[in-house]
Amino acid sequence: IVYRKGTGNYLRGQAWGRETGIYVVPSAGGKPTLVTDDGALPQFGAAGDRVYLMRYGDEDKRSLVSLTLAGADLRTHATSEAATEFRLSPDGRWLAFTERWNVFVTPFVPTGKAVEVGPKASAVPVARVSKDAGEGLHWSGDARSLHWSLGPELFSRDLKEAFAFVAGA
């Protein structure tokens, strides 16, 4: 299990807001291990040996980074000027992101250099999958569909509807 431990506040109090950061803990139980003290929206990669998370960098630039479960080998995979959420597909082949309230999908190509993603990115194909807006991105277990919400509604889109080169399109 990977999770973010946040700070306390005036509603919850400060007692449980110490030692914030991104943690991993075995699903069978055990002691949580700190991966990093900086980041949000953590998730495991396809192999389960890395934690992917979102970070805010210089001049408010957003990044999708990953680290080993021990917090080593920091890699920056994608950057964006305005993304508010990154979600890697369970098979590690696709990256969904929200930017300016819309939901987009692009192939995830792990390279030695970060790829700039956005609606007008040209390095890799990008497809807008939301009609109006969306948040709370999550993938189906088989990575064939992306789901998101908008207010009280839940939406889904198959990848084959977004990209002609996906099998079954």
Model segments located where?
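A short helix->beta-strand "capping" segment at the edge of beta-propeller domains
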Residues: 121-130
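A flexible loop/linker signature enriched in serine peptidases of the S9 family
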Residues: 2-23, 27, 32-65, 69, ...
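An N-terminal, helix-rich hydrophobic module
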Residues: 137-141
